[in-house]
Amino acid sequence: MAIDLSHNRWLPALSLSLLALASSAAAGCSSATKDDAAVTEDGSGSSNDDITSVNQSGVKRQSIGNCWLYATTSWLEALNKAETNTELNTSESWLTYWHWYEQLANGRVGTEIETGGWYGTAANLINRYGVVLEKDFIKLEAEAEMSNRQSSALKAANESLKSGPLKDAVARRDRAAIRKELDAAWQLDADTVARIDAVFGAGVERTLDRAFVNAAPGNGILRARDVPIRIKIGAAGQLVSATLADATGTGSSFGTRSGRLAFNTVAYPSDAAGRRAVLKRVQRVLHDQVPVLMSWKVDFNALTQDAHFSLDQLNRLGPGRHGGHMTVAHDYQATVPGIGLLAAGETATPAQMEAALADGTKIEFIRVKNSWGGIRPDRWRDAAIPGYHDLEMAYLDGPIKDCPGEDAPTDPSQCVGTVTPLGDFVLPAGY
């Protein structure tokens, strides 16, 4: 169905129990190679898909475990592009920098910086620190598909945290010293450091949500309220112009986000009826050409050469390297009662999309925009859209073997049980 989000420029109240689940899912993000940072990229590859009907920003490639930030920036770029018809190249590195800073400054770090997270964390970071274009943070990576700077910064910061100045700065809770060490790890130039200081202070005495309520921060930093988006007010509402602040809403200690247009996490149920109900909500959002974030568990032995995640293949090969992941749901393929196959990437009429909401509809796969790069012959030979993957519902429903702590188990008996790969979706209010 042509409800997906394409046109690529470049070639990853909640209950307390769900909060615990989200925290465990935030342990890291899967990347398509053991060490993506070891693979050089010139960022020049590109692909366009002219069949699809909704604008999406370009595919990028994560080099560390921050898929959730790549997914969130893809989401906000698509929302913005729907309103402006222009493509922002926002900086995942910017949000990554602040994610590390908050861990260090708040004493929430062990022997290494945690790279994993989830949507709620990303939304809070955006509200506090805004977004910047990549060219205004890491200039050398303004057009790069993959950020090597993130990988080198993580290595440098962890070394300093282990036995260098960062270890002492964290122990003293010296925010200015923590920022100074992060600036060095990220190899920020003097002009970039000065602009950050001007807005937030050397010791981060200010954040956008508190100090810049009535005035723009300037210095290339955009508040969420400065980023226009286009979105529908609920499934039966009208398309309206809004801002990214409306979509991120306001967080709470319970994990829910408040606001008329706020997106919230919706867990994937365990029963068939509940699953179909949630999938219908996802379909409605995609029908309205709005991107949907989704969290799922990757097992790379399920990845086929044509960019599918297949339960049949996983059952043949047994469990492999695996981990949590977040991507942007983009399109789906389904068999619809009375109609037959609605194929991904092909135009569907309003009547067909309405029929696809029937209880008896069988979704075959969900197509996602990923953060593993566009052209990856080392991992797959072909894909319907470069950089996108088709997650078969049989795989997402599972169950699959759960092997915590085993990077690539050679003995399935090491696995402690089973897990449902599909974890949750992030949906707008009213759906």
Predicted regions and their residues:
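Bacterial N-terminal signal peptides that target proteins for export
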Residues: 2-17
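N-terminal Sec signal peptide cleavage junction
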Residues: 26-29
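Extended, basic/helix-rich recognition subdomains
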Residues: 248, 257, 306-307
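Conserved catalytic-core surface of thiol
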Residues: 335, 340-431
